[in-house]
Amino acid sequence: SGGLNASMGTFARDSDFIPVYVPQPQYPRRAQTRGKEGYAVVEVIITTAGGVRDPKLLEELPEGWGFGRAAVKAATKLKYNPRVIDGVGQEVPGVLYKFSFNMDK
């Protein structure tokens, strides 16, 4: 059972990042009035405190309707439980988040 205790100890000190707050992006007005739906994928760096920085738009479909801009703006408000290794928060680069824009049916 000594092995079990050791692994539980490690588990408590190490944890991966998990989203704890996902903001609702602002639906682009022109897309909304035309009934357009789409999505955008944003890449962020999760900070040691669980915030995000440097959001970059990677993909937007369909293009030109403002989904990308709205997603990047929303991404700045994402909150995560940060990745923790040996009890220390780690910065995590290259994390992707997909925002979907769907009309309420």
Residue spans of the language-model regions?
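Generic alpha-helical hydrophobic packing signal
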Residues: F17-P23, P55, V92, L96-K98
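A short, well-structured alpha-helical segment
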Residues: F17, K36-V41, T47-V84
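Cysteine/selenocysteine-centered motifs that mediate thiol-based redox chemistry or coordinate metal-sulfur cofactors
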Residues: P82-D104
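A generic structural micro-feature
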Residues: Q32-K36, V72, G89-P93
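Hydrophobic residues positioned within well-ordered beta-strands of beta-sheet architectures
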Residues: S1, A40-V42, V95-F99
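Acidic, low-complexity proline/glycine/alanine-rich linker and hinge segments
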Residues: S1-T33, R69, K73-K79, K105
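Residues at secondary-structure transition points
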Residues: M8-G9, V41-V44, P93
